[in-house]
Amino acid sequence: AVTAYRGHIYGITVKTFLPNYNEFYEKRWFSSARELSTDHIYASELLGSEECDYAIPLGNNLIYHLPDAFCFGAEICEDLWAPIPPSAFMAMSGAELILNLSASNDTIGKREYREKLVKEKSTSLMCTYLYASAGANESTTDLIFSGHCMICEGGKMLAENSRIAENNYLLVADIDIERIQADRLKGKTYQDCAGTYGSAVSMRQILIPVSEAFESDGSLRSVNPHPFTPGDTKRRQKRCMDIFHMQIGGLAKRLSICGGKMVIGVSGGMDSTLSLLWLHRP
């Protein structure tokens, strides 16, 4: 994954975990980032030109800083599927955005599994996870690709493409960076984990001098006017029953401690009516 801005390459992120099972046999041709013998490559070697030569950071431990905006890191395809992915150390070192450049083929049920992976990762790392996979034009006689792309923040899917992407397209969404930062400040367990394991991998911080402002009017982000009430009837009924049974459990525990019988004066108001329903419910 090459990170470039205005003709300058700021870093190259290398894949760490190579799949070598089922239809994949990447270790036949490629090596892991763990086997790198250098932490940089010169632009002249990469571009074949001596006109502008400089050292480009190379590895799986790069975090990019955009002044007064956000930090991001990148990982490649199979890295997401690992028990401890490179993105875990990137997030604990400050990256609010994780980008995944992937070539994940389609099989029965795999799309749904990828969705669960990305949602879970954006939840546990308290980040926004941007996932982009190879499109339909990359399909061969052996593998089918659909161009599956997702933008997920804190376990919530902000944007996702249709089933098969045959043409080039952009997937966009408004991301709440300040919410991510606030959640991390509030989440003491996250801070403890970062303090314990964040230094396990030495991350390299790279500044990208971007002058453009990253602002939005929020029109690309849908806001649910009823965040605690599911729109789907079945889910709403389940939510209400969950609340109802929690209240029953709390009242039953209190009565078991106090002993004796329950006496309710039913006035017709909400409190006494609900109390009567809680007691009547087996």
Question: Which role fits each region the language model picked out?
Answer:
Residues 1-265, 273-282:
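Enzyme catalytic cores with a strong preference for nitrogen-chemistry domains
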